[in-house]
Amino acid sequence: MPKLKTKSGVKKRFKMTATGKLKAGVAGKRHRLISHNGKYIRQNRGTKVMSEADAKIIKSWLPYGL
């Protein structure tokens, strides 16, 4: 049986924690930030842990993990 391919877009955008959870950057932070207040910008800095429902779908695109 041939090897399964990993989705290359997924391996670029997500990281896996030591416990197996997925982390990703927050969307909506590229431009037009003047309309958002400082609290929104501060809270969406860095990465966030994905929900279990989303992580299950994303892990199906990573047959061998990251």
From Swiss-Prot:
UniProt signal peptide: none
Recorded GO CC terms: cytosolic large ribosomal subunit
GO molecular-function term, one example from the UniProt record: structural constituent of ribosome
InterPro entries: Ribosomal_bL35, Ribosomal_bL35-like, Ribosomal_bL35_CS, Ribosomal_bL35_sf
GO biological process: translation
NCBIfam families in alphabetical order: rpmI_bact (TIGR00001)
Family: Belongs to the bacterial ribosomal protein bL35 family.
Full protein name: Large ribosomal subunit protein bL35
